[in-house]
Amino acid sequence: MLSKKFTPLSLKNAAKCINNSLRSTYAITGVNLTRGLATNSKVDPKTYAPKPEFSSIAVREMLRKSCLHEFTDEEVATRIELAAAYRLFGLEHWNENILNHLTAKVEEPDGTASFLINPYGLRYGEITASSLIKVDEDGNIKHPGVTGDVFGINRAGYVIHSAIHRARPDVKSIMHNHYPYAAGVSCVKHGFLELAQTSHQSGPVTYHDYHGIVVDKGEQKSLAEDIANKDILILRNHGIITAAESVGAAYYLMYQFLAATEIQTHASANALGDMNNLFIPNNKLVEKTFDVTREKHFSGAKYGIKELSAYMRLLDDLDSSYRT
């Protein structure tokens, strides 16, 4: 005979254990033995997210919509190209979580400029042409895209882009990331080395000193001065920016530069950190390679056009929803 006295607390714990056991049985077998048990839970395990508007169901419903009919043909084309670039950044793991930014300039019917940027909260692999948010030079939203006011933009990040867009009317697209190899190069005193042919194709670089997270609009002037007329700006202790005449050019320039920083990192390791062990080509050879690759006849099209087009076809094979 059992002599142990069962208290209300022990009975409650026993019931809890039985309930958990039944739920485990359901998880393993698919047989729901808990049906009929009392529950106060209002959480739907299939749809729960920390905020309901950020749930898979809510976001997918938004991203199925298209608003491309509201824009000019030029803007639609730019939206599709920029959405493709976001998807490719995600595919290559060039982004840092949902951070970093790619922007593109579009001309309005009245001749003024607007800029496209990602909703702050979408994964790069979710971005569509219709989800891109249109802002003015100051980051004020002119068209929220299909996500409405759910996400908005990362205004701190736009400080960098707006500074360069203002200073460089020749630039259509700007891309920024913190890719580890590029960020690593930004942290060493000698900076970027033009070692292999890949680095010669990306062209000359310039630098901007670190002032913490770029949130101060007062820093915009020095950003504009530091990039000057170059297409690559290394943000010391931070990351990398490419700025170019098209989305394709900014994308392919980023591709080549990131590859070059990876080569430099491996070469430096192989050289045991001794600069004397590195073969660095002379400037004339570097300039020759750069000039050849930027000539239209080299590929038969403007820089970056064939490259972006090729990878848009890859995206079409994988998931063409970026075009929505």
Swiss-Prot record:
Entries under InterPro entries matching the protein: Aldolase-II_Adducin_sf, Aldolase_II/adducin_N, Aldolase_II/adducin_N_sf
Induction record: By stress.
One Pfam family linked to the record: Aldolase_II
SMART domains: Aldolase_II
GO biological process terms on file: actin cytoskeleton organization
GO cellular component, one term: cytoskeleton
MF terms (GO), sorted A to Z: actin filament binding
NCBIfam families hit by this protein: PRK07044.1
PANTHER family with a match to the protein in the record: ADDUCIN, PROTEIN HU-LI TAI SHAO
Similarity comment: Belongs to the aldolase class II family. Adducin subfamily.
Protein's name in the database: Adducin-related protein C1289.14
Source organism (scientific name): Schizosaccharomyces pombe (strain 972 / ATCC 24843) (Fission yeast)
Higher taxonomy: Eukaryota, Fungi, Dikarya, Ascomycota, Taphrinomycotina
